[in-house]
Amino acid sequence: MMKKLTYLILLLGGFFSVAAQSEELMVDGMRAYMKEDFGEAILVFEKLAKVQTQEPAVFYYLAKSYLADKQLTSARTNAEKAHLLSPYSFDYGLLYGDLLLANKEYKKALACFENLLAYDDHRFDNEPDMIRVKQFVFLSKGDEAKELADKNKYYLQAANLGPVQEELWVRIIQLDWELNRKEAVVEHALEALENYPRMAPWVFPILGDAYQALGNNSASDAAFDKALAANPKDDHVLNNYSYFLSIRKEKLALADSLSARLVADHPKNGTYLDTRAWVLFELKRYPEARIAMEAALKDKENASATLWEHYGDVLFRLHLVDKAIEAWKEALRLDPSRESVDKKIRMRQIPEN
């Protein structure tokens, strides 16, 4: 009995000795870490890790010490150990996930962050790190989603959490446009502009297009005016603004000026020459419109059914009816669904509205 008691005392003494030594090493390691003596901290925590093999805090601070010392591989290895030992810890998982990102292991980082969000870590939703993790998850899911609507949903969830990069707003607004959600285009473009005023040269052109599609002509014109104030040579704006004015038969003098500037900078672009021709057509300057249209048709890649129909209209106004019908027939060949063109051919004239 006496031998057993002696053995137990010796065993407990050894245990308390190890515990005391571990506690002392932890204090020394933390002291070195706080003093930013990361080399010393690494030595201490490495020694401690050999004794406390199941203590996640040891590997966590060892990883942070390696990270501060710019030894990313060792930092990642120890952060993973801390995370595996305590998968419910937000801090351990966050460090591991960030190191995975630094190592471009994006899928593993996504899985790590998704697991963190699944745990009840008693974190507030508005904490910066929580927001950052959620935004990464939503952005990753958005990038992976195959359906445009799903992409848009995830990107918006990321944006609604707080400030995001300008690039994300561009993606959201472009998806709104592709999904034909013009009201959403306006809403999100204005929100992006409020958060990032320097996005004005990109936002105002798409606002002009969206307002025009929604039938808000005055807002469209105002947006295009602001776009040109930000970038007077924006060819997209010069083209769309002048074309929209021409089909509305409004501010034709402005449309004339804008389209002239456009083709001066892009003298061989068929689409832009077509816009110029149509402005001239609405101004009843038919000989000039014909010259512009024939130049547009030399751009074979952009010689669309629309261009051929417009060319036919110009020729008709010049009383070249047979040539007009030939042009309309070419338009119908390129796009057989154009009932308006078929009607022009059958009537041998442009129907009056």
Question: Residues of each region from the PLM?
Answer:
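Residue-level recognition of tetratricopeptide repeat
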Residues: 30, 64, 98, 139, ...
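Conserved structural position within tetratricopeptide repeats
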Residues: 47-50, 80-84, 117-118, 159-160, ...
